[in-house]
């Protein structure tokens, strides 16, 4: 059996669901990048400066807490990062959310942009 045959046997409703989920994740990343006025390229880059890393960690936090996305999928969407990087970013922002009013306000504002209802 060839790769083409295998891929043709995947149910189209399953593929639509997978791609639909990625659209949701990408929207969250886009909203974060727009909020911080940085490009999507910067969000997925290897740049570790605080001006880029913090929004990226907030995107990790939102993808993890607002979806059922596996950590490795979040990492793939954010430039091929390892699941342990995602765990670190999510934990860091989670701690800040609990202890820092500014971080809480930023995240709540971004959540409202993602889900205005």
Predicted stretch roles:
Residues 1-18, 25:
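Conserved C-terminal helix/linker of AAA+ ATPases
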Residues 2, 26-27, 33-34, 67-76:
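Short, charged amphipathic recognition helices of the HTH superfamily
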Residues 14, 31, 35, 113:
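Residues that form generic nucleotide/phosphate-binding pockets
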Residues 18-19, 61:
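A short, ordered amphipathic alpha-helix with a cationic face
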Residues 19-20, 51:
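Residue-level marker of alpha-helix boundaries and capping positions
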Residues 20-46:
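Basic, low-complexity segments
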Residues 42-117:
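Terminal-proximal interaction/regulatory segments of ATP-powered molecular machines
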